[in-house]
Amino acid sequence: ADGEAVAADAVVVTPDLPVAYERLLDLPPPAVLRRKPRYSPSCVVWHVGVPGEPEPDAAHHIIHFGADWQGAFDDLLRRGVLMRDPSRFVCRPSVHDASAAPAGSQALYVLEPTPNLADGELDWGESARSAMRDRLFGFIERAGYSSAVLTERLVTPQDWADQGMAAGTPFALAHTFGQTGPFRPQNVRKDAPGLVFAGSGTTPGVGIPMVLISGKLAAQRVDEVLR
């Protein structure tokens, strides 16, 4: 940030790849980014602390499916609006990690898929944030979770964008045919020896296992440079 130049044999770039090209790199982006890229849907995540410890038989991961599967995905992928009948994912980390919340309470988060900022016309200002919070509060009440909220944090697509994620999605470039496998941005460039990429925007793709693999591949590339 202060203009200091640091010499290096290899540099691993891990920010979201399109944002790295836009803000950090004085290099032309790969072809898939020069065309109009397709981004994965985004999501809202509501982190909540509530009183009471998890039940002995409580599940760590729970998916609550909506009834109108096709309509929900039409809303998400074609219309670019909030799903009228969404499926939601609930994670209760306190089930297996007592340190996730103080004694006598528990942590959970609720994830609802939403359009990304490129495909949707949603404004995630204070009014929309408040409406989404109320929507998710109503969901946890209906689903039987404790609704006596002690602490909370709502993360929206705009928050993801503010954190440096292209199109406001934490799930990077969509796994379409033209953005998968050999067509996904590669983790090295022939015109920039020693520059290596890792993360969900490069190969092999999205998801914790694949991102971890991308780190392993990046380490191998760095090893090749340093030999």
Enumerate the language-model features and the residues they cover.
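Mid-domain catalytic core of redox enzymes
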Residues: A1-P102
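Hydrophobic, well-ordered secondary-structure elements that form the walls
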Residues: V12, V48, V110, I140, ...
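Conserved FAD/dinucleotide-binding core of flavoprotein oxidoreductases
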Residues: P18-R23, G49-P51, P102-G138
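Short glycine-/acidic-enriched loop or helix-start segments at secondary-structure transitions
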Residues: E22-L24, P182, G207-I208
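Flavin-binding catalytic cores
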Residues: E53-P54, V81-M83, D123-A161
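A glycine-rich dinucleotide-binding beta-alpha-beta segment and adjacent secondary-structure elements
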Residues: D85-F89, G144-P204
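Short glycine/proline-enriched loop/turn "hinge" motifs that connect secondary-structure elements
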Residues: A98-S105, Q186-K190
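A conserved FAD-binding loop/helix module that cradles the flavin
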Residues: S200-D223
